[in-house]
A protein has these predicted regions:
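Small-aliphatic-rich amphipathic alpha-helix that forms the alpha element of a beta-alpha
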Residues: 62, 80-86, 175-196
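Short beta-strand/turn micro-motifs at beta-sheet edges
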Residues: 53-56, 87-88, 164-167
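Non-catalytic interaction/regulatory modules that flank or connect domains
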Residues: 80-93, 97-99
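Terminal amphipathic helices with adjacent charged low-complexity linkers/tails
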Residues: 21, 31-33, 103-109
């Protein structure tokens, strides 16, 4: 059987669970995604056929990288990382991701400075007890929460950067890919997390 028409969610579930490989999709979204930097087997992994131990091994291999090479990342690699991100699941299969690329070490440094300026302003506001308590009095406890939980660590991070050049935000990364979602999506925060 070939799935066509407007009723399909194009999620691929019917293909994944069919025991006889009897279903195909006409929709081009399920054609092979071409990658220039690596190859992969273009076959669905049948339910129950993926080794749990391999998933556990993958999850245990996860690490935060804070040691980056002092060279820019090829544009092709950044584009392919985004392609991989678009294969992530999303709430209601809406796939409303927004990928923003900061492509060079110089751009990352400029972006980091802008973020630092934002947090310096936020720290000044949260350190103003009249403003903080006034907002709390009118039912907005966000600034008080920020001051209690983040003020000191953000202050230290900003001082480290300004006085010693230590980048605790991007750790000297050569490029950054930020993933966001549209507010009107069914679960934008979760979708963005799954695509990273």
């Amino acid at each position: 059987a070939q799935i066509t028409g407007e009723e399909s969610l194009t999620c691929g579930h019917c293909i994944a669970i069919c025991p006889k490989d009897a279903i195909s999709l006409k929709n081009s979204e399920f054609e092979k995604i071409d990658f220039a930097t690596f190859t992969y087997e273009n076959k669905w992994i049948k339910q129950g056929k993926f080794e749990t131990s391999e998933l556990v091994r993958l999850m245990l291999s996860r690490r935060s990288c804070r040691n980056f090479k002092d060279k820019n990342v090829d544009k092709e690699i950044l584009e392919e990382l985004i392609k991989i991100g678009t294969t992530a699941p999303s709430g209601s299969n809406c796939q409303d991701w927004i990928f923003t690329v900061v492509p060079t070490k110089k751009d990352v440094a400029i972006f980091g400075k802008k973020i630092g300026e934002f947090f310096k302003k936020l720290n000044r506001m949260s350190n103003n007890i009249v403003l903080r308590k006034g907002m709390t009095l009118f039912g907005n406890k966000k600034l008080e929460f920020y001051w209690e939980n983040y003020y000191e660590s953000v202050k230290e991070t900003i001082e480290l950067y300004e006085n010693k050049g230590v980048d605790k935000l991007f750790h000297g990364a050569s490029a950054v890919i930020m993933v966001g979602g549209l507010k009107e999506s069914s679960c934008p925060s979760e979708d963005a997390l799954l695509a990273t």
